[in-house]
Amino acid sequence: MTESERKQIIALIQREVIPAIGCTEPIAVALCVAKATETLGAKPEKIKVLLSANILKNAMGVGIPGTGMIGLPIAVALGALIGKSDYQLEVLKDSTPEAVEEGKKLIDEKRICISLKEDITEKLYIEVTCEAGGEQATAIISGGHTTFVYVAKGDEVLLNKQQTSGEEEEEETLELTLRKVYDFALTAPLDEIRFILETARLNKKAAEQSFQGDYGHALGKMLRGTYEHKIMGDSVFSHILSYTSAACDARMAGAMIPVMSNSGSGNQGISATLPVVVYAEENGKSEEELIRALMMSHLTVIYIKQSLGRLSALCGCVVAATGSSCGITWLMGGSYKQVAFAVQNMIANLTGMICDGAKPSCALKVTTGVSTAVLSAVMAMENRCVTSVEGIIDEDVDQSIRNLTRIGSQGMNETDRVVLDIMTHKGC
C-alpha cells in the first residue's frame, strides 16, 4: 500500500467517523436550518422544509436531544434558534430549556412547514428555506449528512455544487476491498490511526451514562439484570449486548450524549465500536490490538456503505455489526481468511432486515446485529463459512458485499416505499 493511498484512507476515516449528538437525520435537518438561518442573518418568521422520503422516515419517531420531544418540528425550531452550522452533527449542543420553550412557540404558531420533496432520486436530501422581513435564504444538503450543495440569499447564490462535488468524486476514486481494509488496519503506523480510540472512549461513556438512566426500552440496562443473567449468563457475550444496546437506548431516546458516528449514523458508530471494545477489554488485549481491531471494524463499515449509500431500506446495524464481527474475529486470532468467513456468515444471516426509521426499538435491531456478529466470528474461527452454493453468497467476499448492497440499494426500493406508506398512515 502506497503512502498516498494510506493517507487517503486515513482522511476518509476522519471524514466518516465523527461525533454526533442525537439521531443524525433530524440533526442534519437542524444543521441545514441553522445554515439557512445564518445566511438569512435574522430569526426566521417562516421555515419551509422539503425532505427525501428516507430522511422523513428516519426522523419521525426519534427523540431530539435536550427536548424530551420526538420528531422533526422541534429539531427544525432549535436549528433556527440556537443551531450553529460550525458544530456539524453537534449542531444542537447549545440547546437550553428556554430555547425549547421558544421552539414550541414556533411550532404552535404554525411557522414551520415540513413536506416530502417529490420526484428526486437522492435518498438523502434536505432543502430549507427561511424567511424574515421580506427576505429569504435557502440551504440544501444532499448525498451526505453534512454535505451542503447549495446556499443562497435571495437571488445571490453563495454555493452551488449540485452538479458535481469534488469531495464526492475523491471518495469514489478510493476503491476499497476487504483485503485492503484488513491490510491497512494491520500495517498502518500506530500513531497515524490512534485517533480511532476516541470512538471507544465516547461510545463506552454513552453506554455507561445510559445504565444510570431509563432510556427508551432500557434494553441495555435490562440485559444486566439478575433474571437475564440466569438466562443469558454474565459473560463477554452478554456484556457486548448490554453495552451496545445501552448506548443505542440513550441515543434514540434523545439523550444529550455525544457518540462517535460512522458514515453519518450514530447507531452504526456504536455497533462498529462497542462489541470490539468489550471483547478486547474482557480478554486482556493490548491497546495496539484494540486500535487495529477498531480500525478494521470502522473501515469495513465505510467500505460497505460506499456501495450501499448513506440511507437505504436496509437496516444500518447489519452493516455496522459486520464491521465489529471482523474486528472480533481478528482479536480472536483470526487470519484474513477467517475475517472474510465472518463477513460471509453475516451477509448470509442478516441481509434483508428492514429500516423502518430511527426510534427507540433500534436498540433491538442493534442487539440482533451484534449477537449475530459474535456468532459469525465464532463460526469463522471454527473455519465454518456459508458457501457459494447457498443463496446470495459468492465465492468472492467482495462480490458477496456487492450482492448485499445491491439488495439494499436497488432490490428493496419498493419495500422502502411501502414502509414509509405504512408509517405515514398509521392511526396514532
From Swiss-Prot:
GO terms for molecular function: L-cysteine desulfhydrase activity. It comes from the Bacteria. Pfam families: SDH_alpha (PF03313). GO terms for biological process: L-cysteine catabolic process to pyruvate. InterPro entries: Ser_deHydtase-like_asu, UPF0597. Belongs to the UPF0597 family. HAMAP family: UPF0597. This is UPF0597 protein BF3772. It comes from Bacteroides fragilis (strain YCH46).
